[in-house]
Design a protein with these regions (language model features):
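Bacterial N-terminal signal peptides
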Residues: 7-15
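Carbohydrate-active catalytic/glycan-binding domains of CAZyme proteins
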Residues: 20-549
């Protein structure tokens, strides 16, 4: 009787359980009819890796120098994903990553589950191999442990063998090591926390598969398998390598390529074997300024013992990507997407937000009034562009076409304090308000080649009267309530502003998006003041940030 009651109530309870889960207005891969459309993650989760634990799936991705780092996403069906946490609160050494270190830090992590614990390994190309652990992937992770010091070691992945021994595979960054396209394996201590063996080259793709990197190490039916990309980010392909010995030699086969599809460079990712006996492969697709989005492909083991990924005809040994396919078998019907909008009502930042460097509490904090306060941070004395500013609060772009609107109050104590919204990358553009005397100047701030020393320029668009003025005798502020908006379509961003939230005016010319260093363009907030400032800081109170069509 009890089971019958539960079975009757379950369809009613499931929507309630999912009520707190985020649904995107701009991209949802679940088609609602048992199929999905790629990408399953339409945002910059580059170099993805995933692990299955029972009927749950956990994914992480490269975070480079963005903080918090190592995002943790959860899914019940490999299609519907949500952000549940981060494994890295700050980058070490803290003082080095206290300022932006674009393109450095966490490269191509691997997530694994071993004896009741989750492990994430990654290579920092300037420092070595690191690992963090957790029993709950959505909870607290340990502080990073350095498994191996070294230069150029990237794209690391462990394997615990049947005899309890632990091995680590890695690729090499040519920019640091002076060579690439080589994969090496070495033995770790059984707990996986330190290297005890010397590296051996197990594969050199230099002549036939250039830019071999991003390896993931598995074992199946007595075979050791290396899944790795080759050919480069934009135009590469996916390899599978196998050997009866962990140290090789390995034979290689291409198992996924672009083929006749528009999906360039379908490679680097994770083989996932589900509790329902199915095999799937998650990989990225480079979309320039939008970053590297994540696709899901079916994977099949053929009679000759080799896998084929994606769509392949009879007798073909290499597949090409599906744009649409049936969903993996799952007991879950929940539709959920990674968070984008934020009302700032919960007392903590949404998990979609990251800083450009290790966070300083002086940069900002949530308020009891349901806002995110962002204080004007001191720009460096040698300021050229916001490429140097760690306090940018940013998130990934959620789709190719979307609108992002922020409602905020800017409060200024002194001249030349400024803040607003920004579309950030190696070229960037921001729509800001700056105090000048007793008024605010609406300005577009633009920079080309920020990564190579480009200098920010300012264009004043309008003069705006304050919404409110303090009457206190000590350090009075003037305040401006304003709505700022970005509309993105086809790689172009247009800016708008409004003082009432209903009537928006265009603010300046169109801006062409450009990616950051190894990451896609990002959007969010900026709040700054000159390095010479000595008085009280100004601030943004961001009431909300909403992503819509």
């Amino acid at each position: 009787m009890f089971r019958k009651i539960i079975s009757l109530l379950l369809p009613l309870l499931l929507p309630l359980a999912a009520a707190g889960q985020y649904r995107s207005e701009v991209w949802c891969p679940d088609n609602g009819n048992g199929t999905y459309s790629n990408p399953v993650l339409n945002a910059d989760y580059s170099d993805p890796d995933a692990v299955a634990v029972g009927e749950d799936y956990y994914l992480t991705a490269s975070s480079f120098s963005c903080i918090p780092g190592l995002p943790i996403l959860h899914s019940r069906d490999l299609v519907n994903w949500e952000i549940v946490g981060h494994a890295l609160k700050e980058q070490l050494p803290r003082e080095v990553f206290g300022s932006p270190q674009h393109g450095k830090g966490v490269w191509a992590p691997a997530i694994r589950f071993h004896e009741g614990e989750f492990y994430i390994y990654w290579g920092d190309p300037d420092r070595g191999v690191f690992v963090v652990k957790a029993t709950d992937p959505a909870g607290e992770w340990t502080a990073p442990v350095c498994v191996l010091e070294g230069k150029g070691i990237i794209d690391t992945c462990p394997l615990w063998d049947d005899d309890g021994k632990c091995y680590l595979i890695n690729a090499w960054a040519g920019s640091r090591a002076g060579f690439n396209s080589v994969l090496t394996i070495r033995e770790l201590s059984p707990d996986g926390l330190r290297a005890i063996g010397s590296p051996r080259i197990v594969y050199d793709g230099g002549q036939t598969n250039h830019t071999t990197e991003g390896p993931k190490l598995y074992k199946r039916d007595g075979w050791y398998w290396i899944f790795c990309p080759a050919g480069g980010v934009q135009r590469g392909w996916q390899l599978a390598l196998r050997s009866r010995s962990i140290f090789g030699p390995y034979e290689a086969r291409t198992v996924l390529f672009q083929g006749s599809t528009p999906v360039n460079g379908p490679h680097q990712g994770a083989w996932v074997h589900t509790a329902f006996g199915e095999d799937w492969f998650l990989h990225f697709n480079d979309r320039g300024a939008y970053g590297r989005v994540v696709f899901l492909q079916p994977m099949e083991w053929k009679g000759d013992g080799w896998p084929v990924i994606g769509k392949a005809g009879k007798g073909e040994t290499c597949g090409e990507p599906y744009l649409k396919f049936r969903k993996p078998q799952s007991a879950s019907a929940a539709v959920v997407n990674p968070a984008e909008s934020d009302e700032f009502d919960g007392g903590t930042l949404g998990l979609q937000w990251q800083w450009q460097a290790n966070c300083d509490e002086l940069w900002g904090m949530p308020t009891a009034g349901g806002c995110m306060r962002l204080y004007t941070a001191d720009l460096p004395e040698d300021f050229r562009s916001l490429w140097q500013a760690g306090n940018l609060l940013l998130q990934k772009l959620p789709a190719q076409d979307f609108t992002a609107t922020a409602k905020l109050r800017f409060s200024s104590k002194e001249d030349d304090q400024w803040g607003g919204i920004i579309m950030m990358g190696m070229n960037y553009s921001a729509l800001t308000v700056r105090r000048r005397g007793d008024v605010f100047l609406l300005q577009r701030l633009d920079c080309k080649g920020a990564d190579t020393g480009g200098v920010q320029t300012e264009t004043t668009l309008a003069s705006l009267q304050p919404t409110e003025r303090d009457t206190i005798p000590y350090s009075p502020a003037i305040h401006l309530d304003i709505y700022l908006r970005m509309k993105v379509s086809g790689g172009t961003c247009r800016f708008f502003y409004s003082t009432d939230g209903r009537h928006f005016r265009e603010a300046g010319s169109d801006f062409t998006l450009r990616q950051g260093k190894w990451i896609g363009a990002k959007m969010g907030f900026v709040s700054e003041r000159p390095s010479s400032s000595k008085g009280n800081r100004g601030w943004i109170d961001a009431d909300w940030f909403r992503v819509t069509r």
